[in-house]
Amino acid sequence: MTNANTRSTPYSAVKPDVNLAKQEETILDFWDQEKIFAQSLNPEGKKTYSFYDGPPFATGLPHYGHLLAGVLKDVVPRYWTMKGYTVPRRFGWDCHGLPVEYEINKTHKIESRKDVFKMGVANYNDACRSIVKRYSTEWKTTVRRVGRWVDMENPYFTMDVSFMQSVWWVFQQLFNKGLIYEGYKVVPYSVGISTSLSNFEANQNYKMVQDPAITVMFKLVNQPDTAIMAWTTTPWTLPSNLALAVGNDIEYVKVQEKATGRKLIMAQALLSSVFKKADEEVEVLQMMKGTELVGLTYEPLFPYFGDRADKGAFRIISSDHVTTESGTGVVHMAPAFGEEDYYACAKAGIPMVNPVDDDGMFTMEVPDYAGKRVKEADKDIIADLKKRGNLFKQDTIQHSYPFCYRSDTPLIYRAVSSWFVAVEKIKEELIANNKQTSWVPDHLRDGRFGNWLEGARDWAISRNRFWGTPLPIWRNAEGEVMCIGSRAELEKLSGQKVDDLHIEFVDKITIPSPTGKSPLKRVDGVLDCWFESGSMPYAQWGYPETSVEDFKKAFPADFIAEGLDQTRGWFYTLSIIGTALFNQAPFKNVVVNGLVLAEDGRKMSKSLKNYPDPMEVLNQHGADALRLYLIDSPVVKAQELKFSEKGVYDIVRKILLRWWNSYSFFANYANIDGFVPKGDAKKSPNILDQWVLSRLNGLIANTHKEMDAYRLYNVVPHLLQFIEDLTNTYIRFNRSLFWQDGMPETKRYAYETLHEVLVTLSRLMAPFAPFMSEVTYKNLAQVLKDKKDSVHLESFPTADLSMLRPELEEAVKAMDTLVTLGRNHREKIGVKAKIPLNEIKIIHRSAELLETLKKFEPFFVDELNFRKVVYNPNEDQFVQVTAKANFPVLGKRLGPKMKAVGAGIMSMSLENILKLEGGGVVVIEGEEISLSDVEIRRAPKGDNANLSVHQIVSIEVDPTVTPEQEREGLAREIMRKIQVARKTADFQMDDKITLEIACDGALLDALNAHKDMITGETLTKNLNILALTAEPNGKHTETSDIDGQVIKIGVTNLPR
């Protein structure tokens, strides 16, 4: 090792101890000052890579779900930027809709639409506008701190006129294509916020609840003491009952109760569930098909709509949706409150009644319950049915029920007048376009999302609300209709100036009738905010009024990413609108992440305080750690993650600090030796250099392959494993080489290799851990002629496939395994690692692998501390090899043949087992079996306590320990104590020292026997051995013990 004072120091000194989080703050300032993000966006000579960012609401603080999606949206664009593309990243804000209105309603104690009109729609919308950017500062801080690069200074807002008129254009295009219609439809409805919800909104908040489950008797007309029975969990819908439905082909039965004489009709298959002891309780009178019941009439339960009997109500009809899975096989029909009810009654010509207002309260049409919320009226309705003699049985049922995802109140299903997108008209095109997209995980495309498309219903896109993009339809009493596509069009047709497109502005504007009839006024309602976010690919540019070229470059998106819930949200609405406009999916690749839960497996909750504050985690452990933790977890496979702060810390401890230590090791030793690279690492004849360069280039190739396919879950684990291999294998086995004096070629090549690896690693890791990558690159690349201002302005590394040496990689895997086996075996026989053993026998069937492994012997023999290594390819002499069926894999494939094939695998010959290990195929019971179908096991033959067996390699150890070997072991322990003293004294790595040692007995014998080894390894120039009773002198002194024997050490560093 060369004295650092005699050479220049090419690199900044690196302290082994580092505060990663503080260091990241410095890098953030560097990026801001040098405008690195802006530089990376330079489009000169580059192709455009298009990315759409789904807009969040700024009415809430960012949580781990946002951070996860944000990291994914950062990693992929960074990667493609380094691949030579320009990747515009424009942030957007979702401004309209229920989330904003809900906040205002809470603040102003608004409980109904009347309260809004009392406040004034303009004032209400001004209040909504005022909170849209409430947490935008916190969002900017968090997004910046996590290391995400996105343009938040020039965002789009869905409430901007330019955005809203693009949404109008989208609506107009669909309208002109006949894909917009007005009609009634039973939809999920939130009484908490007085508006309908889309199906995908309704699916977001299911809860287990207890509801009444009652069986009701409907008395048949002209059939004394005879009733047909129906079962329901929504008693509040019974005042609106207009029909009963049966299944045409279902067998029904008329029975007579022995106790009461009543005659009751129900499905024969459900008789035993209605009567627990049917044989004892009832007598069967008649069997009949459902067709025989159709047309019978019954008495209304309540008098409110009795006059509807003249219009065909209160009769039995047939419906395909009736089953015998539960209840009575007879379904009570309230067409205003059930989708199937609505369609069946419409088909039967029975008009609906809807005695429930927009706030979920009964109207005066049902005076006994008027003013009551529907669910609150259940008890009163049940009591009245009991009084009237219509209640047969009352139970309670526990079931999963949808709640409003905003107000957390139970949803009802309610017929509303709405405007719809005719999704069912374009369903086949939707499904076909989806087939052209790539999903990660891939099963979602044809699974969860594909299934959702298969069952797609027409989309109710109007909302009876205030803060949103108004429906752009004007019409008059005579039925003339105009659909407006822009502000300019509205101004032209109305002759009035239009400053804003919100309802308080446009509702004042009328359009003269082109035929001289009454003026056209805008229809009530605003567009679902999902329609706005689904229009984002067009509206973010103000297309088609402006930015036509920007839109064309960016459509369709190369990449989007959001959570699993968006398969029924943003991904869905994007697909509908893209298909409706251009018959094209608006994205090519989509990465779907799972849900981040609290560590206890529950949903993260502010009230429960069951998760750490994201900013505290970032400031404690750093953004790189959080990023790597998230993207190296099941959540990037759309699975759940139970968030653990310990998991983030483990990334710091196991990955980032190891990476830092490798970097620190290189920089500090290279400074001591004044090393500047020539760039010829690839010419190194050293086998460990060749191995690590092979690993590096294989890693680069894999990263390209998997990142191009957006499979982050196949990228990050390999990157992290490489960091571990770099520190635990390459540097560990090469450490003594860097300690040598001077600069022999082997040492120079090791420096060349480590520099090449660390600089390349900084580029490889840049998209994933942008801070550490920047720090290491800035320091290590400063000696390179073609260095960039930032690692993020570098190109992504490309693999040199000529450097791949799979035989070396296989040998090093075997070396790592045998080192572990050697340590474990020492522990088993109670011999410390410092004591040399005589012989280790390395056993593997492949003579070629053993021959390659022999080349690594100089590296692992010292680590294992054996004096002799023997290589034995005769595995059969030591090891029993067997195979067992991989039941989870084969069971699905083979079904009933599994037992026979499993037995065949168990009795398979060694020749066939080895054939499988070599990549071949074996036929058993007519089935082709490959390596993935079996589990191959190795076990020791006989009773050999000195044998340790592993799938990769096995060893046999000579456990003999002589007194001379014990002395050498003690000498190595003494060396370790001296090195600890040097470090405690804070000496430089290359400082020469004067050493004073006081000891006696076996320690003194070991010191005298191995004096040269101890002084050489510890850079000792002067050694004084003292009696144990003496006290050594030195700049640093300490007293310790080895195996219970006292040793005193004094160290002084010599002048340079």
Curated annotation (Swiss-Prot):
Its EC number is 6.1.1.5. It is found in: Cytoplasm. Gene3D superfamilies: HUPs, Isoleucyl-tRNA Synthetase, Domain 1. A motif ('KMSKS' region) lies at residues 603-607. The keyword Protein biosynthesis applies. The keyword Ligase applies. Pfam families: Anticodon_1, DUF5915, tRNA-synt_1. It catalyses: tRNA(Ile) + L-isoleucine + ATP = L-isoleucyl-tRNA(Ile) + AMP + diphosphate. One of its GO terms (molecular function) is isoleucine-tRNA ligase activity. Its cofactor is Zn(2+). It comes from the Bacteria. ATP binds at K606. CDD domains: Anticodon_Ia_Ile_ABEc, IleRS_core. Coiled coil: none annotated. GO terms for cellular component: cytoplasm. IleRS has two distinct active sites: one for aminoacylation and one for editing. The misactivated valine is translocated from the active site to the editing site, which sterically excludes the correctly activated isoleucine. The single editing site contains two valyl binding pockets, one specific for each substrate (Val-AMP or Val-tRNA(Ile)). Monomer. HAMAP family: Ile_tRNA_synth_type2. Belongs to the class-I aminoacyl-tRNA synthetase family. IleS type 2 subfamily. This is Isoleucine--tRNA ligase. It comes from Bdellovibrio bacteriovorus (strain ATCC 15356 / DSM 50701 / NCIMB 9529 / HD100). The gene is ileS.
